[in-house]
C-alpha cells in the first residue's frame, strides 16, 4: 500500500469517526428534547390541581437554546418551556442546556425572586432532582417536591 493509499484510508477512518461522533451528539439532543417533553407533560399533570382550583394557569411555550457541547460546534435547537401564573404571580420553567457540569441536562424554575434547578441524571435510569441552589444535593422530583416550590405563593 502506497503512502497516498495509507493517507486516504486514514482520512476515511477519521471522517467516519467524526460522522459517528456527530450522530451520537445529535442522538443525545433528540433524547434530551424527548425527555423535556416527558418532564413537562408530568409537570403539567402534577400542576392540574392548581389549575382545577383556578389558582393557576399554564402555557406551554418553545424556547430557542444555543449551547456548545464538547465538540466545539454551536448547536441551536427548540425546546419546550412552561409559563405559569400561580395565584397572580408569574413563574417560568425553562431548560438551560443539555450539556452541563455534573448532570445530563438542566432546567431552571424561575418563580418570584427565587430560582431552583432541575438536574437530569441518567445512571442507572433517568431521574430529575430539584436543587434550591447549586451546592445542595437535591431532592428527587415528585409532585410533593414540586409543590414545595410554589408553597409560598
Each language-model region and where it sits:
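Short, well-structured hydrophobic secondary-structure segments
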Residues: 31-77
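A short, compositionally biased N-terminal segment around positions ~18-40 that is enriched
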Residues: 20-36
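Glycine-rich, aromatic-bearing surface loops/beta-hairpins
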Residues: 110-153
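Short secondary-structure transition/capping segments
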Residues: 2-5, 96-108, 137-148
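Residues that form generic nucleotide/phosphate-binding pockets
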Residues: 10, 14, 46, 148-152
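Hydrophobic-cavity lipid-handling domains and compact docking modules
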Residues: 61-119
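N-terminal, Lys/Arg- and Ser/Thr-rich interaction peptides
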Residues: 1-25
Amino acid at each position: 500500500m502506497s503512502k497516498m493509499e495509507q493517507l486516504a484510508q486514514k482520512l476515511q477512518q477519521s471522517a467516519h469517526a467524526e460522522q459517528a461522533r456527530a450522530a451520537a451528539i445529535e442522538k443525545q439532543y433528540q433524547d434530551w428534547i424527548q425527555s423535556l417533553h416527558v418532564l413537562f407533560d408530568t409537570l403539567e399533570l402534577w400542576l392540574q390541581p392548581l389549575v382545577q382550583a383556578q389558582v393557576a394557569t399554564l402555557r406551554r411555550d418553545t424556547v430557542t437554546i444555543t449551547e456548545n457541547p464538547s465538540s466545539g460546534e454551536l448547536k441551536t435547537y427548540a425546546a419546550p418551556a412552561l409559563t405559569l401564573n400561580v395565584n397572580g404571580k408569574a413563574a417560568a420553567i425553562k431548560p438551560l442546556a443539555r450539556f452541563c457540569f455534573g448532570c445530563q441536562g438542566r432546567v431552571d424554575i424561575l418563580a418570584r425572586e427565587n430560582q431552583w434547578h432541575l438536574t437530569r441524571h441518567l445512571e442507572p435510569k433517568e431521574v430529575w432532582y430539584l436543587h434550591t441552589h447549586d451546592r445542595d444535593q437535591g431532592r428527587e422530583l415528585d409532585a410533593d417536591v414540586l409543590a414545595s416550590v410554589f408553597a409560598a405563593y
